[in-house]
């Protein structure tokens, strides 16, 4: 059995910083609030909850005694209106919005002021997109996953930072084909970490007989890695933890490739490697 692990695994830098901030804050406090699910990973959420982190998903979840408490804004970011309200309800608000997301918001804002209508390739209900909508002029904004005809002629095209590079390129080609823009700007706003993980997944899946994509089942970037891998390696499995390996048939001849989503902790990867090492030993 051969085991190959992608070079880029574990949390991305934005998630890691937010996770560290939560853990450090809990050293001095017995509880801390997080606005929105920190990461799309059940194991991480359970770990933080047991340590004293409390997730709130909206203003209705804020307790009456919150004025003495600290709240952390996750890496996806939120709307300006939400942030202003939270600052009135909590004594301390720590904004951990990923810099890449912040840069996208600022760029869209600037270009709208320059007269551009903005088309965003992304999921309308994704937390990052909801935050973007709440910080820019929605009347000059379209969020879509499908190429559509647009009456505006001066257009900026950008992407949600966690979308697939190849899918974004296909979207651009299609939307340019069905529209006649007089002025169009195209900006690559996909996170470089996302692109590098995609490339590693592509390479590993082409030389593996079995691929393990480790990450939350509701994680957008993990689902994307799974789709890429499945194209080239039919025996691709999307798993959340090492416990699921018991359901997968592994042979001594397998060449196993392992990749992780950006919201997957290294601890979960280590459990998977531990299980596979034991399997390898049992085969020999």
Curated annotation (Swiss-Prot):
Binds 1 [4Fe-4S] cluster per subunit. It catalyses: isopentenyl diphosphate + 2 oxidized [2Fe-2S]-[ferredoxin] + H2O = (2E)-4-hydroxy-3-methylbut-2-enyl diphosphate + 2 reduced [2Fe-2S]-[ferredoxin] + 2 H(+); dimethylallyl diphosphate + 2 oxidized [2Fe-2S]-[ferredoxin] + H2O = (2E)-4-hydroxy-3-methylbut-2-enyl diphosphate + 2 reduced [2Fe-2S]-[ferredoxin] + 2 H(+). Keywords: 4Fe-4S, Iron, Iron-sulfur, Isoprene biosynthesis, Metal-binding, Oxidoreductase. Dimethylallyl diphosphate binds at residues 40, 76, 126, 219-221, 263. Its cofactor is [4Fe-4S] cluster. It comes from the Bacteria. [4Fe-4S] cluster binds at residues 12, 98, 191. Pathway: Isoprenoid biosynthesis; dimethylallyl diphosphate biosynthesis; dimethylallyl diphosphate from (2E)-4-hydroxy-3-methylbutenyl diphosphate: step 1/1; Isoprenoid biosynthesis; isopentenyl diphosphate biosynthesis via DXP pathway; isopentenyl diphosphate from 1-deoxy-D-xylulose 5-phosphate: step 6/6. It is an enzyme of class 1 (oxidoreductase). Disulfide bonds: none annotated. Isopentenyl diphosphate binds at residues 40, 76, 126, 219-221, 263. It holds the Pfam family LYTB. InterPro entries: LytB/IspH. GO terms for biological process: dimethylallyl diphosphate biosynthetic process; isopentenyl diphosphate biosynthetic process, methylerythritol 4-phosphate pathway; terpenoid biosynthetic process. Its EC number is 1.17.7.4. GO terms for molecular function: 4 iron, 4 sulfur cluster binding; 4-hydroxy-3-methylbut-2-enyl diphosphate reductase activity; metal ion binding. CDD domains: lytB_ispH. The active site is at 128 (proton donor). (2E)-4-hydroxy-3-methylbut-2-enyl diphosphate binds at residues 40, 76, 126, 161, 219-221, 263. Belongs to the IspH family. Catalyzes the conversion of 1-hydroxy-2-methyl-2-(E)-butenyl 4-diphosphate (HMBPP) into a mixture of isopentenyl diphosphate (IPP) and dimethylallyl diphosphate (DMAPP). Acts in the terminal step of the DOXP/MEP pathway for isoprenoid precursor biosynthesis. This is 4-hydroxy-3-methylbut-2-enyl diphosphate reductase. It comes from Petrotoga mobilis (strain DSM 10674 / SJ95).
